[in-house]
């Protein structure tokens, strides 16, 4: 047999001991099976060190070393010492950047949905070779590289990630490690990575790791729920399932409901809102099924009464949630954003500001639940235009003309869309270029916040505890890292809810030009997050050169501060035309990650 030398296959195929097709940049065998290709990097060479200490040198060589040392000492008497402090390892820099800006600032257990807030405390207790440690190190280094060097590098093969995958499979097969909370959390980290990969490549995210985490929680639920961390993870899984059920118009899955005590762990206002979200998902599925039945057979008005009553009861629960939420969570209305260069982009010149983007995201979820209910009501009213006022009275407590009820519902949709649009200036500010490490120190980026002098009414700020408000530096770091993600979620929802079978009922409720503005803002957030490369012959966005070490950017922008670059909002519709299918896939991947 001819010896062709060492295998040239990818690291994943080598570990699995299967033949690799050696495709570049990733092999097709891995891609077809939904595996992460480990790439073709050679393992580090084994180094052999030769002793070079004084006792190991030859006598003649020792004399030469002594002469050089004495000479260096004499010359150093007249010159300052040179600092040779070693730079931190790349992994340490990456963890500090990711945990600090994405999982630290602006997050807390009071508003937590149970994922990002757990990472740093859990990592502190983990050994270096645990699945969670390896997964976080791999994810963090990919995120840091994307910000430092190449905004389109996230989906390139990564050897560290392939090693972490192998370690997770070992942990799941081990009876003791599979019961560990850190193993479940590691699976969620891998799912978060899968979601980011899908978003950046505009593809549909797979649920493999999420379903695995659900299976582990169901298998060891009672044990895992005995700790606060375990209960937080259950809430996170519940939120992701609610979002997926609403997007896919299906009921909340019984597989998640089988997790013990899920309904008895509200914990905080965001978790209480998620419990209402279960009812929203179920009634949406019920209305959709009802509309499909109407197309096949006539139904009686009494079949409609319980559905209208259910819609109204859920809406009352949503209004009660708003009235009982922390006062510190209430948004502050700003009638006019301040002037900057480039300008802060807003729909009608106004915006809302929040304590942080995580709380703004929770309010966006609340508004999206209301939109789902309003849309369901319009579907029923449109399907049964001759419904009697008596049926409406049963559901709403008073007789109403059907046309008046429909007009009131459309007005509520318009007001809710306006509120969701007011989130965008808070999250996006005046950003018009692809995000890079330079943005963390850039002085030309501006965001409406409670730190802006004259922006907020001082009496309105009194409802926010000052000891819980972020410093200006922490707020800017937090919103530059996560703001575009939290704008992307409501923007993709608003477009998606207008694109499906009954989307015209919602779109007809909006004022002219509003959907076009939403499309442009979605395109701007896509540009900032580098989800697509610029179109041919388009202007070049501000990029950063490879940075130095931890925390120092070492960047040189290719544009002057304030220049428009690739992010000229007037060009976004041309550069980034997204189909309804792409918007729906984007929304699905975002929701599977918990909205980032």
Named regions from a protein language model:
Residues 1-130, 157, 557, 574-595:
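Charge-rich, intrinsically disordered regulatory segments
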Residues 11-14, 28-32, 38, 137, ...:
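Amphipathic alpha-helical interaction motifs in eukaryotic regulatory proteins
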Residues 305-596:
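C-terminal effector modules of eukaryotic transcription factors
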Residues 8-11, 28, 162, 211, ...:
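Amphipathic alpha-helical interface elements that mediate macromolecular binding in regulatory proteins
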Residues 82-100, 104-319, 323, 327-361, ...:
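Intrinsically disordered, low-complexity acidic/Ser/Thr-rich segments used as protein-protein interaction/activation
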Residues 28, 134, 184, 369, ...:
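Residue-level detector of short, conserved catalytic/binding motifs and their immediate flanks
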Residues 34, 38-41, 172, 221, ...:
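Eukaryotic basic, amphipathic alpha-helical target segments in cytosolic regions
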Residues 42, 148-151, 201, 377, ...:
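Short coil/turn segments at secondary-structure boundaries
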